[in-house]
Amino acid sequence: MLPPLPSRLGLLLLLLLCPAHVGGLWWAVGSPLVMDPTSICRKARRLAGRQAELCQAEPEVVAELARGARLGVRECQFQFRFRRWNCSSHSKAFGRILQQDIRETAFVFAITAAGASHAVTQACSMGELLQCGCQAPRGRAPPRPSGLPGTPGPPGPAGSPEGSAAWEWGGCGDDVDFGDEKSRLFMDARHKRGRGDIRALVQLHNNEAGRLAVRSHTRTECKCHGLSGSCALRTCWQKLPPFREVGARLLERFHGASRVMGTNDGKALLPAVRTLKPPGRADLLYAADSPDFCAPNRRTGSPGTRGRACNSSAPDLSGCDLLCCGRGHRQESVQLEENCLCRFHWCCVVQCHRCRVRKELSLCL
């Protein structure tokens, strides 16, 4: 018998991020991770369904999905670097976080699903996957020029040289459809949502919100063609947003996440506060309050904040007052190595010396 859907989703994320040590929920983000599609797929077959088919037929796609999931966790660590829970994933505690329906878990599922879609789409455009390539020409007209070559802008007047006849889709557009399809196939469970399975509904919604953060923020890039710098013809294509931008937008959604509960039949979600409007497709959802993450707690997966570096003069989340949960902080002088005396050598290398510098750090008690 298959494990419950939420368990399969969490297990799959663990498989993607640490295939060689999934049995112990061993996490090694921050150290070199060797991608082994065979190892992932040997474990993933326990999940059954189309994931196993993808493993057998397209292991190179699975490798990109895993790369994208790790990209998502690194982005989570960047966006949460000043928070009490900083997306640390070096221990079993991360697995316990994934088993809760809290805001932080919503962000993790969204950013890893987004990373999977982003990585596969990028691999297609780079010619690294044989199953896909550039985006097919679109049916709608590309944007009109704004007077600055190479930049999209408002439509030109009818019958002018800037009319639609001079503009067409071309280049190598990023095929987000293919990336979404593979992310959805492997990151989402194919089985029907169980009755009363609110966690599955929440996690699947957050996965889709992550992919939407990639798709809805693709940008149009154009290039002019013509003699002497003229723009006799202009080709345009769709380009993925930088993943840092995807992470920033999902962080905004994290701050405005909606708490939900299930309907009586367990097949849909409603706002926990009935007076609020239902959440949209791009919103992140959660069903339980987060712990305060101040002290270590094996049950919740909280690592605590003792020993974390903080900013003694900042009033925000990175400040010692908030990050240290009122316990206070101590000063410590440490010696670090940094790049210094960097010089550019033609062509095209930047060479630096390594210098030792002493810095004063504030650390939570």
From Swiss-Prot:
Disulphides: 76-87, 124-132, 134-172, 222-236, 224-231, 294-325, 310-320, 324-364, 340-355, 342-352, 347-348
The keyword Signal belongs to this UniProt entry's keyword annotation: yes
Tissues expressing this chain: Expressed in gastric cancer cell lines and gastric cancer tissues (at protein level). Detected in the apical gland region of the gastric foveolar epithelium (at protein level).
Keywords: Developmental protein, Disulfide bond, Extracellular matrix, Glycoprotein, Lipoprotein, Secreted, Signal, Wnt signaling pathway
Pro residues: compositionally biased ranges: 140-158
InterPro entries (alphabetical): Wnt, Wnt6, Wnt_C, Wnt_CS
Disordered as annotated region, ranges: 140-164
Localisation: Secreted, Extracellular space, Extracellular matrix
GO terms, molecular function: cytokine activity; frizzled binding
GO cellular component, one term: extracellular space
Superkingdom, natural source: Eukaryota
Keyword flag Secreted: yes
Lipid-attached positions, O-palmitoleoyl serine: 228
Endpoints of the signal sequence: 1-24
Gene Ontology biological process terms from the UniProt entry: axis specification; branching involved in ureteric bud morphogenesis; canonical Wnt signaling pathway; cell fate commitment; cellular response to retinoic acid; cornea development in camera-type eye; epithelial-mesenchymal cell signaling; nephron tubule formation
Pfam families xref list: wnt
Chain positions carrying an annotated carbohydrate: 86, 311
Post-translational modification: Palmitoleoylation is required for efficient binding to frizzled receptors. Depalmitoleoylation leads to Wnt signaling pathway inhibition.
Subunit note: Interacts with PORCN.
Family in the record: Belongs to the Wnt family.
Primary role: Ligand for members of the frizzled family of seven transmembrane receptors. Probable developmental protein. May be a signaling molecule which affects the development of discrete regions of tissues. Is likely to signal over only few cell diameters. Together with CAV1 may promote chemoresistance of gastric cancer cells to DNA-damaging anthracycline drugs through the activation of the canonical Wnt receptor signaling pathway.
Protein name per Swiss-Prot or TrEMBL: Protein Wnt-6
Organism: Homo sapiens
